């Protein structure tokens, strides 16, 4: 075995002392994105009431970086779809999703958004993943605020580990193409 010697490089002049570390750009960007998600609530039913409780002082979703709830798709990067989505509402949901800028993430909150819930009828969309890609599913009818917080935390983990280049990858473009989203 050879003795390898590590060459320590001295920092540039004026940049000495504590507080410097080396990391990857993906990690820094992922950490920043994960802790500054701006939610856009798309609520149609009782899950929206649970989301209101989640944003209130007792559960305080703001402590996870979702301080500012946006009601403009152009200023949001996390779409929370809550409640029953009718088939007539599906094109509107898709339009809202398309108006969001990249990177954008989707959480399906509750049984109705995830799978249509108990409403297995001709007029109800059986899961929003039929019209837009979903990143995290939160189960429940309606889910408790703790479950919604857990869903946001799971999304944060996904965002932290996502590569900066993922959104321009052929796989991601293929996923969007499968939904006819350009």
From Swiss-Prot:
It is found in: Cell inner membrane. It is a peripheral membrane protein. It comes from the Bacteria. Its main location: membrane. Its cofactor is [4Fe-4S] cluster. One of its GO terms (biological process) is aerobic respiration. [4Fe-4S] cluster binds at residues 46-47, 112, 141. GO terms for molecular function: 4 iron, 4 sulfur cluster binding; iron ion binding; NADH dehydrogenase (ubiquinone) activity; NADH:ubiquinone reductase (non-electrogenic) activity; quinone binding. It catalyses: a quinone + NADH + 5 H(+)(in) = a quinol + NAD(+) + 4 H(+)(out). GO terms for cellular component: plasma membrane; respiratory chain complex I. It holds the Pfam family Oxidored_q6. Its EC number is 7.1.1.-. Keywords: 4Fe-4S, Cell inner membrane, Cell membrane, Iron, Iron-sulfur, Membrane, Metal-binding, NAD, Quinone, Translocase, Transport. Binds 1 [4Fe-4S] cluster. InterPro entries: NADH_UbQ_OxRdtase-like_20kDa, NADH_UQ_OxRdtase_20Kd_su. NDH-1 is composed of 14 different subunits. Subunits NuoB, C, D, E, F, and G constitute the peripheral sector of the complex. NDH-1 shuttles electrons from NADH, via FMN and iron-sulfur (Fe-S) centers, to quinones in the respiratory chain. The immediate electron acceptor for the enzyme in this species is believed to be a menaquinone. Couples the redox reaction to proton translocation (for every two electrons transferred, four hydrogen ions are translocated across the cytoplasmic membrane), and thus conserves the redox energy in a proton gradient. Belongs to the complex I 20 kDa subunit family. This is NADH-quinone oxidoreductase subunit B. It comes from Flavobacterium johnsoniae (strain ATCC 17061 / DSM 2064 / JCM 8514 / BCRC 14874 / CCUG 350202 / NBRC 14942 / NCIMB 11054 / UW101) (Cytophaga johnsonae). The gene is nuoB.
């Amino acid at each position: 075995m050879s003795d390898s010697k590590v060459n320590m490089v001295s920092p540039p002049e004026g940049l000495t002392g504590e507080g410097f570390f080396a990391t990857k750009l993906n990690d820094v960007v992922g950490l920043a994105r994960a802790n500054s998600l701006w939610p856009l609530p798309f609520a149609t039913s009782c899950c929206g009431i649970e989301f209101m409780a989640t944003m209130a002082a007792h559960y305080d979703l703001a402590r996870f970086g979702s301080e500012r709830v946006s009601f403009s798709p152009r200023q949001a990067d996390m779409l929370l779809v809550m409640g029953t989505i009718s088939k007539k509402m599906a094109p509107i949901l898709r339009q809202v999703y398309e108006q969001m800028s990249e990177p954008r993430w989707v959480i399906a909150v509750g049984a109705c958004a995830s799978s249509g819930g108990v409403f297995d009828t001709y007029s109800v969309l059986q899961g929003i993943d039929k019209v837009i890609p979903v990143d995290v599913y939160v189960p429940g009818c309606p889910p408790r605020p703790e479950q919604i917080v857990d869903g946001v935390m799971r999304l944060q983990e996904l965002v932290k580990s996502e590569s900066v280049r993922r959104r321009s990858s052929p796989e991601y473009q293929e996923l969007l193409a499968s939904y006819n989203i350009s």
